[in-house]
Amino acid sequence: MSDPYADDAPEGRIQLGFLRQLWPFARPYRRVFAACLGILFVSFALELVGPWVLRHAIDGPMRGAGPTDERLRALGWHGLAFLGVTLAGAGLGYVYGLLTAWNGQRVIRDVRRALFDRLLRAGLSFHEKQTAGKLTTRVTSDVENLNELIATGVLQSVFDLLKIGCVLVVLFWLDVGLALFTVATTPVVIALSLLFRRNAQRAYRAVRGKLALQNAYTGELIGGVRTTRAYGREDAVAQRYGERNGATNAAWLATVFHFSVFFSLVDLALRATTVGLLWFGGTAVLEGTLQPGQFVQFWLYYGLLSGPVKELGEKYNVLQAAFASCERVFGLLAEPAFPPPRPDGAAGLPSPRRGAARVEFAAVDFAYGPHAEVLRGVSFAAEPGQTIAVVGPTGAGKTTLLGLVGRLRDATGGSVRLDGVDVRDLDPAQLRARVAYVAQDLFLFTGTVLDNVRLFDPTVDEAKVWAALATVGIDDFVRSLPQGLQAPVAERGGTFSQGQRQLLAFARALVVEPDVLVLDEATASIDSEAEARLQKALAAALRGRTALVVAHRLSTVRAADRILVLEGGRVVEDGDH
C-alpha cells in the first residue's frame, strides 16, 4: 500500500536552469543587484590596497634609513591610510548586507505570492493528491530557502570566482614560486566539492522531503485531535509522529555529517598550505630573496585567495539546499491553472444575462482517471426558476455532477450549458458570480462573521449581509453575539455548532445574489427545528432562481419541482413527485 505522505518531489540533477526561471522575479530589482555588484568590486579594490599599504610601511619607514621622527611620521600616515581603507571596507560591507537582504526578501515575497496564487488556481484534482502540510512547506520553508540563492549565493559565488582569478594574477606577479605552491590547494578543494556534491544533493533533498511529510502529518493530527481523543489513540498517534520526527532528524544529521567531513578536509588542505607558505616564504626572507614587507603582502593576499576558495566550497554545498527547494517551488509554479486558457487565447465569452438561468447537461461524461468513470451520458435540463432534487446512493456521482455547473471541474465528454452557452466558453469569474455552491463539507475561515459571509469582499455592504442572514434565519443569533457581525470565528468555525456553520455557509451563497444555487446536502447537518425555518426561507430564496439540490431529507425532496435519480453515474429516473 502506498504511503499517502510519500514525497512526490522529482529526483534529478540540480539544474542551473532554475536561475533562468528565477530571473523574472529578480528582474524588477536588477538595479539593486547591479549596485551590490559594484560594491563588491570597490570592496575588493580596497582589500587589495590594504596589504599594499602594509608592505610599504614595513619595507619603507620601518626598515628604511633616516631620522626617527620622519620615519614615525611616515609610519603614521601609512597607519591612517590603512585605517581609512578598513573603515571604508566596513561601511561598504554594511551597505552591501542591507541591500542584499532588502533585495532577497522582496524577491522571496514575489515568489511566495506567485506560488500562493498558483495554488489557488490549481485544479481540484491537484489538491486532492496533495496534503496541506506539504503545500505549506513549499510556500514557507522552501521559498525561504531561496533567499540564500537570491540574496548572496549566486552573486557572491560568481564574484568569488573573479576574485580568485585576480588574486592569482597578483600572487604570480609578487613571487612565482610561492604562487605555484599556493595554487596547489585549489584542485584539492575542487576535487572535494565534486566528491561530496552528489551525497550533499541527496541529503538536502531528503531533508526537504522529510520535513514536508512531517508537516503534512502534523497538520492532519491537529485537525483530527477530537477523533484521536475520542478513541483513546493518543499513544499510538504519538508513536507514529515520533517515527516521522525521527526520520526528519536522521535526514538533518546526514547533512551535518556531509558538511562536517567536507569542511574539515577543506580546512585541513588550506592550513597545510599556510604552514608550507610560512616555511618557504620565511626561508626566502631569511635568505634575502624576498623582502619582509613583500612577504606580508603575499601572506595577506593569500588570505584573500583562501577565503573565497573555502567560501566557494561552503556555498556550493549550502546552495544544494536552495536548489533542492527550487526543484519543488518551480515544480508547483509549473502546475497548470484551472480552468486552462482557451486555445485561441481569448478570455472567454461574457456570461449570459443575469436572472434565473437554464442549466443543461448534454450527454455529459466524467472520469477522475482512465479507470475511474463517474458520470456516463448524463442528460437533463433545469429550466429557469426550477428546483431539481438529485438523489441516489453513495457513489452515484451526485457531488461530481453539481461541481460541473460552476466549472469546479470540466466534463470529460459532452457539455454543460448555461442559457445555451457551454460553461467552458464563459468567463470563469462571471460564471462563478452567477452560480453559488454550498457543500456539506463546508469551510469557515479564521476571521469574523462578516468576513465569512461576504468572503473578504469589501464591496458587499453590511445591509446585504444582514439580508442574507435573515433569509436563512440566523440573523437573530448573530445579533445576540457580543460583537455581532464582528464576532470572531475560530479556525474552521470551531466556535459554532455544525448547524450554525451550515447556515452561515448558506448565507454566504445568498449574499452574492446568485442566479443558480447548487446545494450539496446543504441541510444535512441542521436539526429539525432549524430545518423548518430554513425550508420556509428557502421557498423565498429560491423564487426566481434555478437550483440543483443533492438531498436525502424527504422535506427537501418534496419542495423540489423535479427529482433526478442517479445510479451508477447514469440518470435512471427523471420526473416529479
Language-model segment annotations:
Residues 1-47, 62-82, 96-100, 104, ...:
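Membrane-integrated ABC transporters
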Residues 2-12, 105, 113-137, 141-145, ...:
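Short intracellular "coupling" helices and adjacent cytoplasmic loop segments at the cytosolic face
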Residues 20-23, 31-53, 78, 82, ...:
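Alpha-helical segments in transporter systems
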Residues 27, 31, 124-125, 141-150, ...:
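An intracellular "coupling" helix at the cytosolic face of ABC transporter transmembrane type-1 domains
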Residues 28, 32-45, 155-205, 279-290, ...:
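Transmembrane helices of ABC transporter permease
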Residues 33-92, 172-177, 272-275, 286-292:
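Transmembrane helix-loop-helix hairpins at lipid-water interfaces of multipass membrane proteins
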Residues 64-65, 170-184, 254-327, 332-333:
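Helix-loop-helix
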Residues 349-577:
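ABC-type nucleotide-binding domain
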